[in-house]
Amino acid sequence: MKLHELKPAEGSRKVRNRVGRGIGSGNGKTAGKGHKGQNARSGGGVRLGFEGGQTPLFRRLPKRGFTNINRKEFAIVNLSTLNRFEDGTEVTPELLLETGVISKLNDGVKILASGAVEKKLTVKAHKFSSSAKEAIEAAGGSVEVI
């Protein structure tokens, strides 16, 4: 592959519809817009979701659910990610943030058991899954809930 062989992704670029001059051009007179009507006008066209006056789908379907104001959003960290730290390191939410493992603290950090931990670490977090807690302790490390 060379620079001059690069092509934009399919459908990412749209060719501007050029208006013809005269009927013979195939795109003159009404410029492909047909005769009169809303779509022939400047700025014409219906809004998103408009179905010609029929009750639109989004209004025919019932509302569902609610937003729980007490919901807690935890930053998730898997065991396999903890292997990047040295043996005997005290892993805290601040350290995870500093090293770029998590992008923001949200309502705390939760450690999940995806992957395996091979190092002896002291892990401090807000929540642990039971299997993650067992795996850290089995590797000789310790777990502390903040």
UniProtKB/Swiss-Prot annotation:
Record's keyword terms, sorted: Ribonucleoprotein, Ribosomal protein, RNA-binding, rRNA-binding
GO cellular component, one term: cytosolic large ribosomal subunit
Ranges of compositional bias, category Basic and acidic residues: 1-13
SUPFAM superfamilies noted in UniProt: Ribosomal proteins L15p and L18e
InterPro entries the UniProt entry points to: Ribosomal_uL15, Ribosomal_uL15/eL18, Ribosomal_uL15/eL18_sf, Ribosomal_uL15_bac-type, Ribosomal_uL15_CS
Region named Disordered: 1-52
GO molecular function: rRNA binding; structural constituent of ribosome
One GO process term, biological-process aspect: translation
Biased composition (Gly residues): 21-31, 42-52
SUBUNIT field: Part of the 50S ribosomal subunit.
Purpose: Binds to the 23S rRNA.
Similarity section: Belongs to the universal ribosomal protein uL15 family.
Listed HAMAP family: Ribosomal_uL15 (MF_01341)
Protein name in the entry: Large ribosomal subunit protein uL15
Organism: Bacillus anthracis
